Amino acid sequence: METCPVLQKETLFHTEVYAYRIPALLYLKKQKTLLAFAEKRASRTDEHAELIVLRRGSYNGATNHVKWQPEEVVTQAQLEGHRSMNPCPLYDKQTKTLFLFFIAVPGRVSEQHQLQTRVNVTRLCRVTSTDYGMNWSPVQDLTETTIGSTHQDWATFAVGPGHCLQLRNRAGSLLVPAYAYRKLHPVHKPTPFAFCFISLDHGHTWELGNFVSENSLECQVAEVGTGAHRVVYLNARSFIGARVQAQSPNDGLDFQDNQVVSKLVEPPHGCHGSVVAFHSPTSKPDCLRHVAAYTHPTDSRNRTNLGVYLNQTPLDPTAWSEPTLLATGTCAYSDLQIWGLGPDGSPQFGCLYESGNYDEIIFLMFTLKQAFPTVHGAQ
């Protein structure tokens, strides 16, 4: 397995008095700004999550370097008496509105407790910003208006985590990937199903998309193709030793062709991964071809050795490449973004990932050519 050289590597969050988990990364193209989010916790455990924090990075295209500002707390992103978890940033290019979605869970109530009691106490929340995250609106609890009575049919749920997606359709639809543990049988354990929250009116109202196959959890989505050939590609965590993927022909409402992706291995209990899509370097401007890149631990036994995979025909689950290593040793969740061309003329990526025993959250920047030098067109 080859190791990828990188343009920049920098620790953004380091566990000392507080712990940090669950990275989310968003690139704002016109502002040349990166927003790196994470959960700030009293300890590494999920029940000790507290707030969502942010570091802002300014990208210098001349030096291919990101300068990061100090950590700040997104103080509005909280419900009283609840802990804030799973940051999911989304930027609406048409309205120039930045959304930060997250879940709010009361006190120290765990996900496992909700699964055992079958009582869903998790809330769907968001804050917004019209100045690229400098200032934020008061928190909005969207649970009743978006999920409604369906909330009681779930044992619990969560969004993302990581970046969301705005589609290239006429409505500029907004998609927030999510999953819910459904109570399908009074005796059987609740079962996780991935889906998307969808907005057709730039975030004013939201609806629930339909579910992907069972045993699909934390997920991300990417848009592949254009026009009549445009589909939403979903890639989800599972407990079955490999990732699960599906595609939606109707902008995230329904998913079909649910498939196990045997080349994308999962460790026991699975792990979050990140996916982005971009135009193939070998395609003409009017070509429909897209390429997908995906980051995730590469070991099927442990959360170790973060890799990046490439798929030049993303709807084919057998077409994923062998991974290129981004980092060795213990690692876990990651979030991936792509913007512009790097100094070698190939697409450039930023990756925010958990390292060590959740000791650090690290930012990496690299190019397609650095990761996959033999890909035609990345020379």
Curated annotation (Swiss-Prot):
Gene Ontology biological process terms, A to Z: ganglioside catabolic process; glycoprotein catabolic process; oligosaccharide catabolic process; positive regulation of myoblast differentiation; positive regulation of myotube differentiation; response to ethanol
CDD domains, alphabetized: Sialidase_non-viral
GO CC, alphabetical: catalytic complex; cytoplasm; cytosol; lysosome; membrane
Chain positions of motif FRIP motif: 20-23
Catalyzed chemical reaction(s): Hydrolysis of alpha-(2->3)-, alpha-(2->6)-, alpha-(2->8)- glycosidic linkages of terminal sialic acid residues in oligosaccharides, glycoproteins, glycolipids, colominic acid and synthetic substrates; a ganglioside GD1a + H2O = a ganglioside GM1 + N-acetylneuraminate; a ganglioside GM1 + H2O = a ganglioside GA1 + N-acetylneuraminate; a ganglioside GT1b + H2O = a ganglioside GD1b + N-acetylneuraminate
Enzyme Commission no: 3.2.1.18
Active site: 46 (proton acceptor), 333 (nucleophile), 354
Alphabetical list of InterPro entries matching this protein: Sialidase, Sialidase_fam, Sialidase_sf
Family matches, as Pfam families: BNR_2 (PF13088)
Residues given in the record as substrate binding sites: 21, 41, 179, 181, 218, 237, 303
Keywords: Carbohydrate metabolism, Cytoplasm, Glycosidase, Hydrolase, Lipid degradation, Lipid metabolism, Repeat
BNR repeat ranges, renumbered to this chain: 127-138, 197-208
Tissues and organs where the protein is expressed, per its UniProt entry: Detected in skeletal muscle.
Gene3D superfamilies: 2.120.10.10
GO MF annotations in UniProt: exo-alpha-sialidase activity
Subcellular location(s) per record: Cytoplasm, Cytosol
Family: Belongs to the glycosyl hydrolase 33 family.
Record function comment: Exo-alpha-sialidase that catalyzes the hydrolytic cleavage of the terminal sialic acid (N-acetylneuraminic acid, Neu5Ac) of a glycan moiety in the catabolism of glycolipids, glycoproteins and oligosacharides. Recognizes sialyl linkage positions of the glycan moiety as well as the supramolecular organization of the sialoglycoconjugate. Displays preference for alpha-(2->3)-sialylated GD1a and GT1B gangliosides over alpha-(2->8)-sialylated GD1b, in both monomeric forms and micelles. Hydrolyzes monomeric GM1 ganglioside, but has no activity toward the miscellar form.
Protein's recorded name: Sialidase-2
Gene it is expressed from: Neu2
